[in-house]
Amino acid sequence: NRLFALIGLNGRAVLPMVLGLGCVTMATLTTRILHSPRERLITVFLLALAIPCSAQLGVVLGMLGSLSFTAVLIWTLAMVGVLMLAGFLASKLIPGRRIPLVTELPPMRLPIAGNVVKKTAGRLKWYLIEVIPLFLIGTFLMFALDKLGVLPAIIEAGEPLVTGWLGLPKEASAAFVMGFLRRDFGATGLFAMADALNPIQAVVGMITITLFIPCFASLLMMVKERGMKTALAMVVIIVPFAFFVGGLFNLLLHAVW
């Protein structure tokens, strides 16, 4: 609770944050448990910006872990630093006050197996109905954009930024586009290029792809929960911020590593 107070939240926000390490789409929905619109807005923003889902996290740690512990440490410190800085700034800029954590502590009891199975089945059914269609819509949209020639145009337009500012090969621009479909696709695209990347490029690429906009399903869930204007405003903030941080680490790491 004291840690989350630094970013304008209370200890209740730990639940969506931890769930975000599994699936950001699901975690966005769980922000409903927070008491105020301000807390829900800050939490959704931080989930979209700096919380990697389990699939992306596995790829990131697999790639950087094969390089060195230093690479993993730099990435971890970057994510924690961005999370705390962005949360602190958001808590100062978004009007409202922090609501203190007040919760009841029920007596500890052994779970009843039947209740656990029933509730798990209910949550699974809800997930399949609410979330899976969003992934299907995202897949179809990316397929249509590819066939219409929009994706190649976006990839080509992003090459100067990827090569000049981030210091990555031009092929890496495709990974960022695929990361919009699913976060782990972007990280996997960089992982497939591991042999062509030096340690600095690998760290910079993974920092940028982690901070990049969430997957299409998460974006649709953000629209559903926070509204179209708020979701688009978050995207407008997150995309340049991710590239700014990535380029900054590119300059810093070349200077000291």
Segments from the language model and where they lie:
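A cytosolic-side transmembrane-helix exit/cap motif
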Residues: 92-101, 172-173, 250-257
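Alpha-helical transmembrane segments
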Residues: 71-86
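Generic recognition of stable, solvent-exposed alpha-helical segments in well-folded globular domains
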Residues: 13-16, 25, 29, 76, ...
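Transmembrane helical segments that form the transport core of multi-pass membrane transport proteins
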Residues: 3, 120-199
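C-terminal transmembrane helix pair
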Residues: 12-13, 25-72, 188-257
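Alpha-helical transmembrane segments of multipass membrane proteins
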Residues: 55-56, 82-87, 138, 142, ...
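Structural signal for alpha-helical transmembrane segments and their membrane-water exit/capping regions
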Residues: 91, 107-110, 139-150, 253-254
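Juxtamembrane inter-helical linkers in multi-pass membrane proteins
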Residues: 1-24, 96-119, 165-170
